Amino acid sequence: MSGFGSRAARPTASDDVCPCGGMPRGTALAACCGPLLAGERDADTAEALMRSRYTAYVLGDGDHLFRTWHPRTRTDDADPDDRVRWERLDVLDVIDGGADDAEGVVEFRARWVSADDGPLRRGELHERSRFVRRAGRWVYLGAE
């Protein structure tokens, strides 16, 4: 991973574990979130989309974040803050959001480190994210 102030490089080996931890755990990026970030396929579930969005934050992929954010709630600039390094994702709960659902909620905790012009800071984001299907595709609607 790159240092602060620059984008993290994408893992290049096909057997690199996905930054989301893999689903199932330990799955390689190429078999987990990689195809979603590349636009090769859509997420089957709300959890898969949430994991791919976390991976996009880790890898600095603002295009994926923008593409998977509901147009009614997204900002004009979806680029991740390159001063923040995301270190770990824990999925705490999933409500609906399956292949046959129209809505879903994924609760997660994501740990981060930042060196924002000062001493190293650590923190975590704890969120219950809402997802909906739009034109058959899962999109992030916002936090509850």
Spans of features found by a protein language model:
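Core segments of small alpha/beta cavity-forming domains
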Residues: 35-82
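Short beta-strand edge/turn micro-motifs at domain boundaries
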Residues: 123-144
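Cysteine-rich micro-motifs
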Residues: 28-36
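Short Cys/His-rich zinc-binding micro-motifs
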Residues: 3, 14-27
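Surface-exposed, charged secondary-structure patches
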Residues: 81-124
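Intrinsically disordered, low-complexity linkers and tails
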Residues: 1-10, 98, 130
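Beta-strand-connecting loop/turn residues
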Residues: 16, 102, 136-137
